[in-house]
Amino acid sequence: MGRVRTKTVKKAAKVIIEKYYTRLTLDFHTNKRICEEVAIIPTKPLRNKIAGYVTHLMGRLRHSQVRGISIKLQEEERERRDNYVPAVSALEQDIIEVDADTKEMLKLLDFHNIRGLQLTQPNTNNFGRRN
């Protein structure tokens, strides 16, 4: 079984990832050296724990977002997806097929001048009945 990570390790790892995401990798030894360069970590075991958690989070970040970590690249990607507008609307149709009852209801609601309305015969299947 693994060990429980302290609040200090988790917070330090998240801050390091947010600031130095582009320099970090999925390799523990590389991340250990980067943590040593960018942060003042008092003890060697604490540095190794932070580097291990950074490596763990980098693996999770590769697949999806991690709660509590905001990376500019992911923010920009999310912003682009949210603001995407297709060239042709999926809701726009040239012909809308309606039956007689629906057309009458639209006429009563003053929607009788909608373009593309086409009257169709309702499909009456006698399911389960034999001739």
From Swiss-Prot:
GO-annotated cellular components: cytosolic ribosome; cytosolic small ribosomal subunit
PROSITE patterns linked: RIBOSOMAL_S17E
Residues of the signal peptide: none
GO biological process, one term: cytoplasmic translation
Pfam families linked to this entry: Ribosomal_S17e
Record keywords: Ribonucleoprotein, Ribosomal protein
InterPro entries: Ribosomal_eS17, Ribosomal_eS17_CS, Ribosomal_eS17_sf
Gene Ontology MF terms: structural constituent of ribosome
PANTHER family recorded: 40S RIBOSOMAL PROTEIN S17
Family: Belongs to the eukaryotic ribosomal protein eS17 family.
Protein name: Small ribosomal subunit protein eS17
Organism classification: Eukaryota, Metazoa, Ecdysozoa, Arthropoda, Hexapoda
Gene field: RpS17
